[in-house]
């Protein structure tokens, strides 16, 4: 079954609802494009020799790229229920992501707060997990979600 958590309206979401997305592999081309686009030329992302001398022994993927890909995995492009991204809290990168790692998103509703007649703020546990089951990016995503039209 495809990921549908953020296709639901505010009233249909329940604390504890959880889903896992499809996976995607992060390639060297992804890292090069991201670093070029953003200007993030930090040596651990771009310099193989420097990275081999580092704590990680090889190049790592920029954390912001991992977070950006999590939105691509977890936010449906045609969603009519998401009114706005309200923010991200408690962002952490507890383990490195390496080139050629395959990641997926594990999302769960942790809290709902009524806002107004149009909808409410939903807080989701937003964890990116690699092919080994290791969480590489953990955060709380806050989304303004529409109420049902009925």
Show where each model-derived region lies.
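Short beta-strand or tight-loop elements
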Residues: 84, 89, 105
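HotDog/MaoC-like acyl-thioester-processing domains
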Residues: 1-15, 93, 97-102, 106-150
């Amino acid at each position: 079954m495809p990921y549908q958590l953020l296709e639901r309206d505010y009233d249909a979401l329940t604390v504890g609802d959880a889903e896992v997305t499809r996976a995607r592999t992060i390639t060297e081309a992804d890292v090069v494009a991201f670093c070029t686009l953003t200007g993030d030329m930090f040596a651990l992302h771009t310099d193989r020799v420097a990275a081999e001398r580092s704590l990680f022994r090889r190049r790592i993927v920029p954390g912001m790229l991992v977070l950006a890909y999590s939105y691509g995995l977890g936010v449906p492009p045609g969603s009519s229920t998401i009114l706005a991204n309200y923010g991200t809290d408690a962002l952490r990168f507890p383990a490195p992501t390496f080139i050629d790692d395959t990641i997926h998103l594990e999302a769960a509703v942790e809290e709902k707060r009524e806002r107004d007649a149009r909808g409410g703020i939903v807080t989701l546990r937003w964890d990116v997990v690699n092919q080994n089951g290791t969480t590489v990016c953990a955060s709380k995503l806050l989304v303004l979600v529409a109420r049902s039209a009925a």
